[in-house]
A protein has these predicted regions:
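Active-site cofactor/cluster-binding pocket
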Residues: 1-124
Length: 124
């Protein structure tokens, strides 16, 4: 069973709900990718997510754009998940520096900003 479901699409988070531990977390984007004609109303999907005790719902695309690039949406999601991962925030920051370091300091800074933006949604 899963400790967390991390999803860039809210309906997808519900698809994997049977695998989530009773005390697990769902961290999901609030904006759906509507790719089927009978996609349920967004409000209904989010209402189902909200039934899970431990949930975080955020508008990943808007936050990523505010940070400076829609390409960092996945790092925004990671930031929102950090309080529940059991890994120190500093270790995650170091991982980002390591992974993106070869792309230059500007890319590292952008991703660290995205990480913090995601985390700040949870720490409000």
């Amino acid at each position: 069973s899963a400790d967390m479901i991390l999803s860039l699409e809210p309906m997808e988070s519900l698809r994997y709900l049977p695998y989530l531990k009773a005390d697990g977390w769902i961290v999901t984007n609030s904006v759906p990718l509507i790719n089927i004609p009978d996609y349920p109303a967004v409000e209904e999907v989010l209402a189902e997510v909200k039934k899970i005790k431990n949930h975080v719902i955020l508008d990943v695309e808007s936050i990523a754009k505010e940070v400076g690039s829609p390409r960092v949406a996945n790092i925004v999601m990671l930031g929102a998940a950090t309080p529940f991962l059991g890994i120190s925030y500093e270790m995650i920051e170091e991982g980002i520096r390591s992974i993106f370091g070869r792309k230059g300091e500007e890319i590292v800074a952008l991703n660290l900003k995205a990480l913090e933006a995601g985390r700040s949604v949870v720490n409000k």
